[in-house]
């Protein structure tokens, strides 16, 4: 669906109690993350797997008359939690994203490549970030993260 559509925005707001995020942003509350993926795509992220089928069917019903596709991609994604004061330096090793605090902050969301893997990431708090990648790349990406985080190869920059 076109995310600027008023009906779409009302449906999302009513269901999740969150505004549809603007370009390159993420909206959050204690239950959900709504991430801007493209002009016609948002990603809903929840930690409660039991809610996924309910969310999917409710959104499909509410958007019935709109051109919209609602998919559950949870089985094909992995989320890594990276904690510590050097997460910006770590991600800068493999991503072209400007990670200076003035450009990437608590409501920022980016899709990019990290270590040759398609990823998306967002801040949870100042010293923690979530990185989402495809399930099939999780082992490679974990090894890349471990290698990039080696204490002998990381210096404070940000």
Q: Could you tell me what each predicted segment is?
A:
Residues 1-158:
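Basic, glycine/lysine-rich polyanion-binding surfaces/domains
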């Amino acid at each position: 669906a076109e995310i600027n559509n008023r009906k779409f925005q009302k449906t999302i707001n009513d269901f999740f109690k969150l505004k549809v995020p603007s370009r390159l942003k993420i909206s959050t509350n204690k239950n959900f993350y709504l991430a801007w993926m493209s002009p016609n795509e948002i990603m809903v992220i929840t930690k409660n797997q039991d809610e996924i089928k309910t969310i999917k069917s409710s959104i499909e019903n509410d958007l019935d008359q709109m051109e919209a596709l609602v998919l559950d991609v949870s089985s094909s994604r992995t989320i890594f939690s990276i904690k510590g004061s050097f997460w910006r330096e770590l991600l800068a090793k493999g991503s072209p994203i400007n990670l200076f605090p003035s450009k990437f902050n608590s409501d920022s969301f980016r899709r990019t490549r990290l270590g040759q893997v398609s990823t998306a990431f967002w801040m949870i708090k100042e010293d923690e970030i979530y990185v989402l990648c495809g399930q099939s790349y999780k082992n490679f990406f974990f090894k890349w993260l471990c290698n990039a985080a080696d204490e002998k190869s990381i210096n404070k920059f940000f």
